[in-house]
Amino acid sequence: MENQIFELQYALDTFYFLVMGALVMWMAAGFSMLEAGLVRTKNTAEILTKNIGLFAIACTMYMIYGYDLMYGGGALLSGISGQGETYSNASDFYFQVVFVATSMSIVSGAVAERMKLFSFFAFAVIFTTIIYPLEGSWTWGGASVFGLYSLSDFGFYDFAGSGIVHMAGASAALAGVLLLGPRKGKYDEAGNSKPILGANLPLATLGTFILWMGWFGFNGGSVLAMASKESADAVAMVFVNTNAAAAGGVIAALLFAKIWFGKADLTMALNGALAGLVAITAGPDTPSALVATLIGAVGGILVVLSIVWFDRKLRIDDPVGAISVHGVVGLWGLLAVPLTNSDVTFSAQIVGALTIFVWVFVASGLVWYALKSIIGIRVSAEEEDDGVDLTECGLEAYPEFVSK
């Protein structure tokens, strides 16, 4: 009887992992639609090619080496197949690999409209094989940071990846954007920012809702169990808090944009939703629903401030606001954890955040610089004018009407 109960719990937890992983996988569609809606028509097919390509690269490279680097267990499939203690090892791998793809997807939008496609893919290989798995091994994997110190000894806590996944992706994106430079025509001779409008806001809105839905798998799956009353209650609370934070982010971003700009900016509302989701990801397990709403609301305000600051003050061109959503708000998410979790300290979160940022930013910067020196990372001015759909992919997403 006891063995039958164990087998039932094992099957339920494995199935739960797979379903949550499938929800996270669907976030790839969300990123694709969001980015396709926020770039110009002449660059749509290329951004979609980036997204499906990076997902395939992440799945392959993490299987070959990244998963072993992050968690150990032997190279290739030896560390993936077989029975775990409470669920299948393969279900754990599947859940983890879609997180890797999510982190890499963040980079795609930030470098949109002017990066060479295969230079991006080359970076994706290194990021998903080494850069992300190594920082993941220091956090969720429990390894020491180059043998110097252990984040677990400090008490660093990141429930589902505000820092480990989102801030890491934003750090890699920032390094790339700094070397890549802004899009042609983004800033005038005086350095003033000129708006470059996205082509399809309905598509961007659809992408945001897909991401919102997928986030329930992202955070809910990170409870790591479902087959007991306690774990089922925990998953339900994480779902509620995730939803509440996203709602808080939308409301705060909309109100703040209305006060600041005099208009209810849809793109800020969309980024507000994502900011709320990123903010709660580090600690959706401890706050009440109301506190989760407030954490998301702070994220919604921060993302509006950050997007404007990066664009107008720092002149860092991020077409979709990815660095602000996932980087700045990812940091806020880490720092918000001690507000509701008394076992976590601000100092631990700061050490963890600095470790993630410094490693990913420096390592990514070196890879981007090497790619720039060897094969180049930016398309020519003429290719940028024509649109990377034609120059990189040889086709157009909207062949009957393309506005250049």
Regions found by a protein language model. Give the residues of each.
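Hydrophobic alpha-helical transmembrane bundles of multi-pass membrane proteins
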Residues: 1-404
